């Protein structure tokens, strides 16, 4: 049984229009569920690249089933599940449903109620008897009683419009004896590899990562080969994703559950050929320079245009306290050394809502590298305060310089608010980025860029709105937390109460480094151009008014912070920004 929310909502969901100027920073609907008991998570999106006139089109699908809301919402209500296939022909601005795939098998447990863990793969060249452009869709079919887990494949020869069942190719048992999360890629020799999680040898390994190889385009598969198998029986490496880097190495990212800390920290390791993984090597935990670590359901990709690894996951945690961080569920990790050494982080293109406990927001987020160099981020997100997940999507560059903010076109995509913990609203009107009233124990802090940035200049037009206020820009920010001045880094602020331009060092409080009055003072409702350049230990601040040719320049040396993210800040009153540029 499905619970219809409204006929209008269903009609609207058939062709979802995505506004590029969405000002709430929450992404835009890929799927607005018409039924209030729909479970929608684990979305996957692909851009067709071997499809002739269909090149550039996007295809998307996700886990789709119906929860038993009257007895146990974690279980299906008996209605068969499906994979809904949606297509966008305009880069993700609008989506239409192409078809819906059901379980056509018969026998005990079929048709399956759970359609879990889908994955698309487009053939870049002929594999077996199947030509370039052939599509595979694999998923994990699980019945209501979880009596088995089954990887099943469908094939499309018309770029996703129709799908033929290929069949089951791996069989697992019940929960704690099952198979999970298939991921397809090509190894160095061009063979098709499926990586997945395996509990079928639970007496030795509660869960391990394994792979199978196909040399005929997915018709048949070879033996199961372990790729990550811990010596500790209770360790549970899981949810593998793999990407090929431009040094020829393959990098695998995965969670490791079952050990302290209990947040399933993300690990990575590399292979020279995509097939040799040294199974007893558990890999390296992903930790940022400012002491954060990723936890649960990772997804990784290599961005050749910026030569950096990107890694998203369900959550981020403080490595000292194991508490969620201010940027939790809305950050992407970056590594510029092929997975070795330090990681930095950047805001995800948009921020999920976790208002509803019935939705596991940001679980297994998906990233797609677009042909235009931006990253499309797709994730489950709360739909209201009590309902299950919708699926939203949005795209933005991640950690790329130079950066020009186009608020009129992109809204808040690529920005997150960490200072006020949801107590202060940021909004977009035309080309302006605005924050509501702040003061007391909170500040409005919106950040963009990467904590790995070192030498750069941020400039913006800033305006105090109303009678009194303090607004400014920040640089080299790390470890942000909710509250007033709760971060490490530098702040450049204009203050109407003093008429000063002040440069601060922040160490979870603000310490003035240099301050000077501006000719004519700082007036509300007037635009001021401010910039802060950080180069080595030298900090250079510049201020000018839209009604004056006079400039005020402050220069100081400070060696406390060498890298960090950039952003905008409001400490008192209300404010607006425009013409934000980082170079």
Regions found by a protein language model. Give the residues of each.
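Asp-box/BNR beta-propeller blade signature and adjacent active/binding-site loops
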Residues: 23-401
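Extracellular carbohydrate-recognition regions
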Residues: 24, 395-421
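Extracellular glycan-recognition surfaces and repeat-rich motifs
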Residues: 410-443
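Flexible glycan-contacting loops in extracellular carbohydrate-active proteins
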Residues: 552-579
């Amino acid at each position: 049984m499905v619970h219809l929310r409204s006929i209008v909502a269903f009609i609207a969901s058939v062709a979802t229009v995505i506004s590029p100027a969405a000002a709430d920073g929450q992404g835009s609907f890929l799927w607005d569920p018409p039924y209030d008991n729909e479970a929608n998570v684990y979305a996957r999106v692909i851009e067709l690249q071997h499809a002739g006139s269909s090149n550039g089109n996007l295809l998307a699908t996700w886990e789709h089933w119906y929860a038993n809301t009257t007895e146990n919402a974690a279980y299906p209500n008996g209605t068969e599940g499906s994979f809904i296939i949606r297509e966008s022909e305009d880069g993700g601005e609008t989506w239409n449903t192409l078809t819906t795939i059901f379980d056509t098998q018969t026998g005990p447990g079929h048709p399956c109620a759970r359609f879990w863990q889908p994955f698309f793969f487009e053939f870049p060249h002929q594999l077996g008897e199947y030509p370039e452009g052939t599509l595979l869709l694999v998923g994990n079919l699980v019945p209501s009683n979880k009596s088995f887990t089954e990887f099943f494949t469908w094939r499309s020869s018309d770029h996703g419009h129709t799908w033929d069942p290929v069949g089951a190719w791996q069989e697992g048992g019940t929960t704690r004896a099952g198979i999970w999360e298939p991921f397809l890629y090509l190894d160095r020799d061009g063979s098709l590899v499926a990586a997945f999680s395996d509990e079928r040898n639970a007496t030795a390994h509660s869960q391990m990562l394994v792979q199978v190889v196909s040399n005929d385009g997915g018709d048949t598969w070879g033996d199961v080969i372990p790729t990550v198998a811990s010596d500790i029986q209770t360790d549970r490496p899981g949810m593998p994703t793999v990407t090929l880097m431009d040094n020829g190495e393959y990098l695998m990212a995965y969670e490791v559950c079952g050990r302290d800390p209990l947040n399933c920290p993300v690990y990575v390791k590399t292979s020279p050929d995509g097939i040799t993984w040294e199974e007893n090597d558990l890999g390296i935990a992903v930790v940022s320079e400012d002491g954060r670590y990723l936890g649960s359901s990772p997804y990784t990709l290599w961005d050749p245009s910026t030569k950096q690894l990107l890694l998203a996951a369900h959550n981020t945690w403080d490595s000292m306290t194991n508490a969620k961080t201010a940027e939790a569920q809305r950050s992407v990790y970056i590594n510029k050394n092929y997975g070795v050494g330090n990681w930095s982080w950047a805001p995800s293109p948009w921020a999920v809502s976790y208002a509803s406990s019935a939705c596991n927001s940001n679980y297994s987020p998906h990233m797609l590298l677009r042909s235009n160099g931006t990253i499309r981020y797709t994730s489950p997100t709360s739909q209201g305060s009590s309902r299950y997940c919708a699926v939203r999507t949005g795209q933005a560059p991640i950690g790329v310089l130079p950066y020009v903010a186009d608020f009129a076109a992109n809204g808040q995509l690529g920005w997150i608010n960490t200072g006020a913990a949801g107590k202060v609203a940021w909004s977009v009107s035309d080309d302006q980025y605005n924050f509501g009233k702040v003061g007391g124990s909170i500040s409005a802090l919106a950040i963009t860029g990467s904590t790995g940035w070192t030498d750069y200049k941020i400039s913006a037009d800033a305006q105090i709105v109303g009678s009194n206020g303090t607004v400014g820009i920040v640089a080299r920010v790390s470890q942000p937390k909710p509250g007033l001045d709760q971060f490490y880094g530098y702040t450049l602020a204009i203050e109407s109460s003093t008429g000063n331009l002040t440069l601060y060092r922040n160490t979870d409080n603000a310490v003035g480094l240099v301050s000077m009055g501006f000719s004519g003072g700082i007036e509300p409702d007037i635009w001021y151009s401010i910039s802060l350049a950080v180069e080595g230990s030298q900090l250079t601040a510049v201020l000018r008014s839209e009604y004056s040719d006079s400039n005020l320049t402050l220069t100081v040396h400070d060696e406390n912070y060498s890298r960090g993210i950039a952003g905008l800040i409001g400490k008192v009153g209300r404010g607006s920004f425009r013409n934000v540029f980082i170079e």
